[in-house]
Amino acid sequence: MSTDLKLTPIRDSNCTLCPLGGMASSERDVCRVGSEPTPYLIVTKNPPSEKMKDEIFSYLEEVGFSRDDFSFTAAVKCRVWDANITKTMTKTCANEYLSQEVQRHKYKWILAFGNEALQATAGKAQVTKYRAQVHPCTHRSETKVFPTIAPGAVSRNPGQRASFIADLTYFRTLSEDAGGTSKRLPDRIRMITSPTGLKALRDDLLTCDGFAFDIETNGFNEYEADSQVVSLALSTWDKGATEPQRCYAVPLEHPESAFRGRSREVLEVLGKYMGTPKRRVAHNGKFDLRWLHEFGCHFDLTFDTMLAAHLLDENRAKGLKPLARSLLNVPPWEMETKALQDEDLKKVLKYNALDTWYTAHLYFIFRDQLVNEQPRLGKLMQMMSVPASNIFTEIERKGIWVDREILQTNAKIAEETLADIDSKLMAHVPHRDEWPDNLKEVNFNASNFARWLLFEHLGLPVIARGKDKEDGSPGNPSMAEGVLQMLNKRHPHEVLDLLLSRVKWQKFSSSFFSSYLDQIDDNDRIHTTFKLTGTVTGRLSSGKGDADKVTGRVSNRGVNLQQVPRDKFVKGVFGGAPGHVFLECDYSQVELRVAAAIAREPTMISLYQNNEDIHMATAMKMTGKPASQVTGDERKKAKPVNFGFLYGMSANTFVDTAWNNYGVEVTPHEAEVFRRAYFEQFPKLLDWHRRQRALAQKFGRVESPLGRVRHLPDIYSPDRKVAAEAGRQAINSPVQSFASDLAILALVNITRDFKRKGLKAFSVGAVHDALNFEVPEDEVRIAAPLIKYHMENVPLMKHFGYHMPVPILGDVALSRYWGDKEEVPEDILLDEGKFDKWLKSHGL
């Protein structure tokens, strides 16, 4: 069978089936098909280009197909790539030609890429809903259709690549009856409907070696009044097993459940035994444990397949369904989860049970990889990821305390201030007769009205523009906050002052206070979500949706604590509940310290070992002055120099970064001088940059000192920009992941020490390089030094065999409110008498 492709001209260049017919001609060929009949037909929206054809083939070959297996055709035969082709046209018009092809060649399977292809071949819409499922072909009953997203969607969003490959892998299993590693369904799902069934489950929990569990709920927030657990499922196994052996499903708050109205009682009983087995596994178990703990079922995880999947390959999709498709070759088991209590009970229980069954299979795969193939990652999983997940379960349940009265007062002030700003801005708006015809209403946001007001009516100069328009004309004048700040510095104007102030107060009002007022609970606390798998570097993220947990439902639980502004007006609404103190311990220059260690840069290491000021040292190098003559502004400029050039930033990029991130104005010439001086002072950083890029080129990955891996397949991209970005990630990823892992390891040790000492202090979260705590007033004298000690003394050598050549320092600050926190000098913190006086002098 030939792999050559031939081109077939359009059937009828004078076609009038749809409005696109008049655009067609016979000058070019439009439909690509194999030169001989093939078992599989690929259908795309439009005829694929040669580049896209080769890209599709590379995906198919990756999962084990041959090019000889496929023909190509298009749902739409017209050459007009930018035409507004509707699904109706695809279904009612273009199908006439497609139907002839399918019937003539008698294809066994159609691989439909994208919505239009799915519509044309199976008569269905929403490829995201029907992907990776088998559908009958509307043109030939013997032909089966397997839809997935279009390759172009993967090109636009590389994050979808893993799930796309998972779909193709499953398609190969189905179409070739490959079998392979496909995992069988459980022989039986034991649906527990009586006390006798609960007793049988209890007996299994008392003797089994481990289990995987999952719950189905009626929402995302366990603390809400109407929250209910719809069902609980478990898959268990005995010691020495290599796959799950038994599967249970317990109906709870479902109309057809025998335990309806008694779910808390059932969960409390099961909770007495679920902590007994040595291995307790879930996929994104933090979600499940929040709910189970809320309903009296208390135990901790020992393994989480989502955490393991992320550690082993941070680039792949981490949802249970795509992992099961790609690693287990199992059929989809999707269902609509928005209203489970309205669904048939048996359907819900089967869905719930299969979640646990395949989670258990993934557990055995990942456990083997972490123990036998990637033991350093296994150590991170054991020492950090799983314990941290259990800790964040409780952090998320408790939430962070908010002073409701201050919140309401500040929200009102923000609204009034915003209204006052708008009133003052209106004084600068000319009469409606002077407006251009295209402007219909006043809009002080980044709008055409605001651009006209600034750059035409007021005549302020344009110092930056957006991207050029499609017709080649210059882009619109930029209204970015940093650009307006720079413009105001160069050309001060009251309107610019007001607009910049408006940006600030609008954020306060809409992005923060409005959200906080909606989310504060009856206990004056706001709950959020912390993601240990939210970034490819491993850095903790906050406030993400729980979409990985339940397909089809997204909930932004609480605030993103990482984005709470430093401004006291916002930060000051958070604090310690009555009788408590808010404490923050922040790592000092941790990325610079970690980079110095990884790069083995002797000058940086020496500065930190001698407790010298690295920003002052850099300022001295930049200016050629002794420390006594360096001005405050010169030292201020050294800070962005140290953090900006650390990873090899260009001088041009530094100009924007220094202004946008640090408010420091630097000329292009100064940036060049600073960059040269920086690497003259720390020359080994350049050697480190080259070393990291070389490692990425050789292995396609780099590692942190603790063994966390950053896979960088883009380092081999023919696109120079893409490859260059991968090279930059090879440098900064190990630093950022190591710094983040230090904080999480410290949190694990702090929490354990709290429990050992019987302290009631607890963490309320982590923000960047800092850990935040709520501490009872009578425990501050014990907890504060303890927190600082553990942040500065993570046992890296003991657990990971790594010696840190520079000291890691943590600065403790505390107050009633987050926005009022004040740093406690180390000599005072570590002296019980001095610390006691300091606390009393601060009213604590």
What positions do the PLM features span?
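Short active-site loop/helix that positions an aromatic residue
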Residues: L118-Q119, G219-Y223, L232, K286-C297, ...
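Conserved "right-hand" nucleotidyltransferase catalytic core of DNA-directed polymerases
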Residues: T173-E253, T276, N315, L327, ...
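Acidic, low-complexity intrinsically disordered tails
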Residues: M1-K6, A178-A200, R816-L844
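Metal-dependent phosphoesterase core characteristic of DEDDh/y 3'-5' exonuclease domains
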Residues: P37, F57, E61, A122-A132, ...
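Conserved catalytic core of nucleic-acid polymerases
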Residues: N390-R397, P461, K489-P492, H527-T528, ...
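A polyanion-binding, active-site-adjacent surface
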Residues: S2-A178
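A common structural junction motif
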Residues: Y789-F800
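Short hydrophobic beta-strand that contains or immediately precedes a catalytic carboxylate
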Residues: L41-T44, T148, F211-F213, A282, ...
